[in-house]
């Protein structure tokens, strides 16, 4: 049986999916607040930079591991403000997170042109060559089989479609790296306990960040899935990186 990491523990693929689903079910109600607290609000700036990689909003966009909908709703608002005709599909494997995304969309009056699909990133229920853009933010490291998810991204994109991924990465050497590691492993789980009542969930999230491949290694994985013109841009000295590629 194939094994992968759930944080620092070795589990089989099916077990990881169940455990990850439990993590996000347990923290769903505090998810947005925790993102603000953990990143000191920086995640909003990272996401603003991320959506700049989508210049054409008259498009079919698939947002995978959509979570509470931050990326898709930013794109929907931008399209509405510009008068663009965007079609957005939000996909996530967790029902509670999708429910929160729907509620936010209704509250922001952005529900029009949005579709919501409960699905795994490694087994998307969409036809080949369906989307102009595939976006995934802070989600791919939680997928049990990352290579399979990348191949699925390639499959559902149209020719010349663009893959864009925002993910935690490897901080460059220096004082920031040491502080970041201390903060991540010692402070964030304590915040998770105080705010979300779940220290273990945030221990997993930090461990998953620590184990995620470096920028260059992930770039190779994207290329091996079939993509071309694969690039990345570090943000905040490499705390996160935006990866982009094309299906040609």
Curated annotation (Swiss-Prot):
Gene3D superfamilies, per database record: Vaccinia Virus protein VP39 (3.40.50.150)
GO MF annotation list: 2-methoxy-6-polyprenyl-1,4-benzoquinol methyltransferase activity; demethylmenaquinone methyltransferase activity
Pfam families: Ubie_methyltran
Annotated pathway: Quinol/quinone metabolism; menaquinone biosynthesis; menaquinol from 1,4-dihydroxy-2-naphthoate: step 2/2; Cofactor biosynthesis; ubiquinone biosynthesis
Group of enzyme by EC: transferase
Record bears the keyword Transferase: yes
Keyword set, alphabetical order: Menaquinone biosynthesis, Methyltransferase, S-adenosyl-L-methionine, Transferase, Ubiquinone biosynthesis
Stretch forming the signal peptide: none
EC code(s) of this entry: 2.1.1.163, 2.1.1.201
Catalytic activity: a 2-demethylmenaquinol + S-adenosyl-L-methionine = a menaquinol + S-adenosyl-L-homocysteine + H(+); a 2-methoxy-6-(all-trans-polyprenyl)benzene-1,4-diol + S-adenosyl-L-methionine = a 5-methoxy-2-methyl-3-(all-trans-polyprenyl)benzene-1,4-diol + S-adenosyl-L-homocysteine + H(+)
UniProt binding sites for S-adenosyl-L-methionine: 68, 92
InterPro entries tied to this protein: SAM-dependent_MTases_sf, UbiE/COQ5_MeTrFase, UbiE/COQ5_MeTrFase_CS
GO biological process, any: aerobic respiration
Family: Belongs to the class I-like SAM-binding methyltransferase superfamily. MenG/UbiE family.
Its biological purpose: Methyltransferase required for the conversion of demethylmenaquinol (DMKH2) to menaquinol (MKH2) and the conversion of 2-polyprenyl-6-methoxy-1,4-benzoquinol (DDMQH2) to 2-polyprenyl-3-methyl-6-methoxy-1,4-benzoquinol (DMQH2).
Name of this chain's protein: Ubiquinone/menaquinone biosynthesis C-methyltransferase UbiE
Gene behind the chain: ubiE
